[in-house]
């Protein structure tokens, strides 16, 4: 039987020698694929797709059939936890995620219940079990969650936001309530990731999409502290499951992030990979960081930019190739193939 620990992805995460740089793509199951759009249409809407384990399994497997990727990522949404807490998640056309019951005041935070994760999010774990059963045995499956801070942003703002005025007001004027909310979310995220691991995921990633809007001190207090808490709990129960942290626009805080005990850091395209490696490469693996906009260009440009990312990281293991954020819906699928082929062709020279 194939030992998943021998997969390129898990070896690179643990900074063990690899023959070439592994690659997967944030949002690799997504709207850029015509086959995904067909399944989503059949599901009726995005949330139905997330809540149907068979359909979630199908869209998770689609990019693996099309491309030689080194990992799959569970198809779900970061806002499943707030939905399970009773906030009423829905997706408005052209607006992204919204809540019918956002947290309007501190009373709502105090009365917010921590849900029973195994029951309320069973559809996620059913999907994970099904995917693990159906996907290639030699490929790892990545589970994920939003960070407590990022979930809190959506829950207090009521959806996406340009300026995050409400949540920032909360952390400045109602610190105690903010910490209460973040602690409830940290407990929920920990339970959520543990259930995903029990269902068969081989690594987990925490997406801190909005950590980069904070001041350095507020990042430490309101985002990093809670991710640290989650990593410590996960490592206590599952020391061998790698944990990846990703704070978008958080390149200035890599040293702090590396102190959490995580195994890898995601870096976005605004961060220089060579200097990131100098700063934290002795402690953690690095994942990233091609600018997603490159996939809208030409074959020559894609190959050149892939080469630049690989050269920037340099020789040796500890690098997982990825985009600096999620792939956009307008990317031609053939350009993804060009990127993957380029990683396969160019990266072996860095692993001699």
Curated annotation (Swiss-Prot):
InterPro entries: UROD/MetE-like_sf, Uroporphyrinogen_deCO2ase_HemE, Uroporphyrinogen_deCOase. It is an enzyme of class 4 (lyase). One of its GO terms (biological process) is protoporphyrinogen IX biosynthetic process from glutamate. GO terms for molecular function: uroporphyrinogen decarboxylase activity. Disulfide bonds: none annotated. One of its GO terms (cellular component) is cytosol. Its main location: cytoplasm. Pathway: Porphyrin-containing compound metabolism; protoporphyrin-IX biosynthesis; coproporphyrinogen-III from 5-aminolevulinate: step 4/4. It catalyses: uroporphyrinogen III + 4 H(+) = coproporphyrinogen III + 4 CO2. SUPFAM superfamilies: UROD/MetE-like. The record marks 77 as: Transition state stabilizer. Its EC number is 4.1.1.37. Substrate binds at residues 27-31, 77, 154, 209, 325. It is found in: Cytoplasm. Pfam families: URO-D. Coiled coil: none annotated. CDD domains: URO-D. Keywords: Cytoplasm, Decarboxylase, Lyase, Porphyrin biosynthesis. NCBIfam families: hemE (TIGR01464). Homodimer. Catalyzes the decarboxylation of four acetate groups of uroporphyrinogen-III to yield coproporphyrinogen-III. Belongs to the uroporphyrinogen decarboxylase family. This is Uroporphyrinogen decarboxylase. It comes from Legionella pneumophila (strain Corby). The gene is hemE.
């Amino acid at each position: 039987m194939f030992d998943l620990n021998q997969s390129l992805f898990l070896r690179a995460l643990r900074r063990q020698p690899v023959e070439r740089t592994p690659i997967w793509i944030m949002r690799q199951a997504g709207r850029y694929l015509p086959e995904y759009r067909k399944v989503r249409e059949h599901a009726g809407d995005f949330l139905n797709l997330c809540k149907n384990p068979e359909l979630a399994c199908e869209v998770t497997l689609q990019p693996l059939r099309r491309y030689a990727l080194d990992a799959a990522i569970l198809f779900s949404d970061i806002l499943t936890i707030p939905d399970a807490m009773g906030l009423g998640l829905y997706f408005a056309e052209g607006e992204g995620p919204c809540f019918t019951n956002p947290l309007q005041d501190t009373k709502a935070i105090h009365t917010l219940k921590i849900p029973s994760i195994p029951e309320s999010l069973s559809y996620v774990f059913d999907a994970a079990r099904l995917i693990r059963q159906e996907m290639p045995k030699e490929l790892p499956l990545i589970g994920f969650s939003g960070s407590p801070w990022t979930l809190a942003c959506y829950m207090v703002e009521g959806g996406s936001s340009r300026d995050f005025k409400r949540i920032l007001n909360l952390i400045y004027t109602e610190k105690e309530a903010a910490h209460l909310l973040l602690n409830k979310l940290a407990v929920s995220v920990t339970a959520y990731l543990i259930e995903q691991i029990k269902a068969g995921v081989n690594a987990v990633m925490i997406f801190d999409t909005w950590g980069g809007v904070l001041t350095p001190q507020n990042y430490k207090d309101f985002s990093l502290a809670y991710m640290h808490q989650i990593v410590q709990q996960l490592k206590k129960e599952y020391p061998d499951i790698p944990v990846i942290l990703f704070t978008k626009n958080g390149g200035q805080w890599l040293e702090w992030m590396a102190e959490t005990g995580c195994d890898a850091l995601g870096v976005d395209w605004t961060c220089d990979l060579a200097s990131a490696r100098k700063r934290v490469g002795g402690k953690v693996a690095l994942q990233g960081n091609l600018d997603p906009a490159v996939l809208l260009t030409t074959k020559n440009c894609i190959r050149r930019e892939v080469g630049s990312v690989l050269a920037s990281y340099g020789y040796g293991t500890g690098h997982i190739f990825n985009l600096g954020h999620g792939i956009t819906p307008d990317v031609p699928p053939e350009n993804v193939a060009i990127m993957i082929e380029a990683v396969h062709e160019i990266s072996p020279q860095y692993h001699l």
